[in-house]
Structures are given as structure tokens and as C-alpha cells.
């Protein structure tokens, strides 16, 4: 039985995964919420209004 050279299969496998990641990465990033520190800092500095339960 002849021995197969694994090199082209590794390159095909890696290339296909890279193409898949490049295509899917913007779609995945659009679903992840943005965790930039400026937004968190702005949210911490602005006071949140409190609605009192007895009013």
C-alpha cells in the first residue's frame, strides 16, 4: 500500500479553516457586545435615577 504525503492535506485543512474564520469573524463580532472601557467609565460616572417604591 503506498504511503500518502500528508503535507497537501494539512495545507488544505489549514487554508479552509482560515477562509472560514475570515468569512465568519465579522458575523461573530457583530453578535458580541462591545466592552470598550470608555463606555463602562461613562456608565459609572453618570448616576442612575432611583425610583422610590413608596412614591
From Swiss-Prot:
GO biological process per UniProt: proton motive force-driven ATP synthesis
Membrane topology per record: Single-pass membrane protein
Domain of life: Eukaryota
Gene Ontology, cellular component aspect: mitochondrial membrane; proton-transporting ATP synthase complex
Summary of the function given for this chain in its UniProt record: Subunit 8, of the mitochondrial membrane ATP synthase complex (F(1)F(0) ATP synthase or Complex V) that produces ATP from ADP in the presence of a proton gradient across the membrane which is generated by electron transport complexes of the respiratory chain. ATP synthase complex consist of a soluble F(1) head domain - the catalytic core - and a membrane F(1) domain - the membrane proton channel. These two domains are linked by a central stalk rotating inside the F(1) region and a stationary peripheral stalk.
Quaternary data: Component of the ATP synthase complex composed at least of ATP5F1A/subunit alpha, ATP5F1B/subunit beta, ATP5MC1/subunit c (homooctomer), MT-ATP6/subunit a, MT-ATP8/subunit 8, ATP5ME/subunit e, ATP5MF/subunit f, ATP5MG/subunit g, ATP5MK/subunit k, ATP5MJ/subunit j, ATP5F1C/subunit gamma, ATP5F1D/subunit delta, ATP5F1E/subunit epsilon, ATP5PF/subunit F6, ATP5PB/subunit b, ATP5PD/subunit d, ATP5PO/subunit OSCP.
Protein name, UniProt field: ATP synthase F(0) complex subunit 8
Lineage per the UniProt record: Eukaryota, Metazoa, Chordata, Craniata, Vertebrata
Amino acid at each position: 500500500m503506498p504511503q500518502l504525503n500528508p503535507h497537501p492535506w494539512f495545507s488544505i485543512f489549514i487554508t479552509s479553516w482560515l477562509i472560514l474564520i475570515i468569512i465568519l469573524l465579522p458575523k461573530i463580532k457583530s453578535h458580541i457586545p462591545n466592552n470598550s472601557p470608555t463606555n463602562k467609565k461613562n456608565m459609572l460616572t453618570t448616576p442612575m435615577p432611583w425610583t422610590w417604591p413608596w412614591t
